[in-house]
């Protein structure tokens, strides 16, 4: 009978949260196995905008976001993938949107000499130039200089390759079944582990359905597309619109946010019904990622109604005054719940780490460092003893 393999840390899920967990573990000298039931990294972590929106977060998300920022910069250097530090652009097309940006800028003033400016207010001319918009589109805007952008299709794979080089083992096409303290039963047999990290995004409702129901986790399906368009100049950063100002927590905590929400909902009920977040990122090849709509439920329909895609294209063409040619369409899914994170040690040394809203690229690496790293630090004596057995 062959002996059961043993690792200090087994991570279930090779998306950005799982990769972050593997990084936190290998940084602490652990032996690490990452398993994923897919043959490639193909979940939400490659289907997103690649927008690392640190500034509009608050509370725990802000802590994780700022920790993530350092890790993204380090990884981009160490793993050698493209990262852009030009910051996020926000176009205000109405006075209430500009008012919200002014409130945020006043709240995020640098507290000490030399501290970074987090929100730079822009004139209408400035935002139109930086975001390739026609004259007369904006009443003003802002730049959020701390924010970063990556190309998600390449970043996750580059991080995996970097981790491989540091001795982390990846076992793809391998599904986790029963998970209990010390052991993961996989579709290739059992594996023993000092610590198990479950980073399976919305599939948490399959692995731990009772816990997922307790947290009110459902799935959120998003329609996305990649387009080419003959814009007069490139975007100088991810571009958010008023629809984004009613989403991210630091924006929604501003007094003007309810004015923006009420007006947009009254003016464009059909877009509000799609739960639209009209935003854009431009990839290094010049094509633009366009999104997104949101549909929440226990399952996500495999059939994508064309009205969402039509609305995304219409809004693109009306904003930029340029035709968009669709290159690709896809659907993304993430877990969503009342709180932004589901973090629980469901059994001793079994950590569940799920970002339960659409900010996992922004916060996932920091979450992994703060939750998994802190757990390993606390349990380092046990770990060293078990590794030496
Ligand atoms: C369309 C879209 C746009 C988004 N835009 C942004 C953005 O711009 N900025 C931002 O911060 N966030 C964004 N997000 C959110 C972000 O992408 C996610 O929060 C993040 O990628 C989640 O990472 P993850 O590692 O938890 O999940 P995933 O990347 O989905 O990885 C989970 C992995 O678990 C594996 N798995 C599941 N069950 C099992 C099992 N039983 N056994 C083995 N493996 C299993 C899956 O195969 C998958 O590979 C967006 C999300 C979507 C869908």
For each feature predicted by the language model, list its residue ranges.
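Dinucleotide-binding Rossmann-like beta1-alpha1 core, especially the glycine-rich loop
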Residues: 49-130
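Core beta-strand elements of the Rossmann-like FAD/NAD(P) dinucleotide-binding domain
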Residues: 5-7, 186-195
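Active-site substrate-recognition segment that forms the wall
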Residues: 52, 82-83, 202-323
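C-terminal catalytic lobe of FAD-dependent flavoproteins
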Residues: 275, 284-289, 295-389
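Short beta-strand to alpha-helix junction loop
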Residues: 63-64, 91-100, 142-161, 303-308, ...
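Helical element adjacent to the flavin cofactor pocket in flavoenzyme catalytic cores
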Residues: 142-180, 193-194
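Glycine-rich FAD pyrophosphate-binding loop
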Residues: 26-46
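N-terminal Rossmann-like FAD-binding beta1-loop-alpha1 element of flavoenzymes
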Residues: 9-33
